[in-house]
Amino acid sequence: MTTEHLNHRHWHQSGTYEVWYVTWNHPGTDQGFWLRYLSEAPVDPASRAKPASLHSGGPPRGELWFARFDPRDSRRTFGIHKHFAPPTDREGPFALGIGDAQLGHDHAVGELAGGGHDVRWDLRWVPATQAIRHLPDVTYTKYGNLGVTSVLSPNPRVPLSGSVTIDGETLTFDRAVAGQTHVYGKRHATKWTWGRCADFAGAPGAVLEIIGVHQHRGVQLPRMLWLALDLDGEQHRMTQFRHIVKNRWQGSGTRVEFSAWSPTVRIEGEMSCRPEDMLVAPYLDPDGTEIFCSNTEIGDAHVRVFRRAGLAWREQRVLVGTKRAHFELGGRVRDPAITREHQLVE
């Protein structure tokens, strides 16, 4: 079964954004990478209902974002992004073009220079046969969209091969573990967390993905978390509205804690890193609202899986992913402890 159609472009109208991103690590050095292809279509100023003090989004555009995270020398951690003309896209097969860079369902090729860095990537992967849908099923229908952002992973855990050249240094990849996700929406959540780990020690094939949001719609709504875990041939999906009641998340600084529940399985975990292992990515919503996203691709994940035994819970597995947790915390306020910024270049 193919998941290619899940990468097809969802939006073309103004007031929307759409992102396709890939995250992965280099097995030999533990370096982490974050590659984003972005379509941004700001709100038409004539229809803007919010105060003029908001940032102007400008005309529709494409953007390329690249970040390298180095756990051995944080001075080598950096991120750069650049604006381009609006993306070109097609279906059958899916293809997205931004500048000279290309993204397909099974490959990413491109280059980006600026801020003292020169980056080139030529990457291929074997597409997944099953996707992860992070949100309740109804939200992916035209009647159930939450009205903020939708997210799914057409390629949640795939073997990636190819090369990345950064400032003249080339790293090669031979079936490294990677994940590719597709996000589309009209605005970011008031606060959110995203996290994934697909390279746990002693758990081949396992992949964990979480999405947590804290929305403000006139009043502050309760925190919501959705969690998906593939482990030992089983798929655990705590992603429906019935799970929200007992699912929990809490995050600040460089740490996220979470728990999720079904009648037979309970999952508890955390992802963490050092402040110097994060970058602040400055986003603009289509309406001009500033958003700040603190991201790392070299965090640590620690997850405990419990199975119900009668009235009690028994620990079944402990999963550890050292320097393999990819996670972020986002919101309207920048975290002052994260000092390194993802830089816009000309």
PLM-predicted stretches and their roles:
Residues 1-346:
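Structured soluble/peripheral alpha/beta segments that form catalytic or ligand/cofactor-binding pockets
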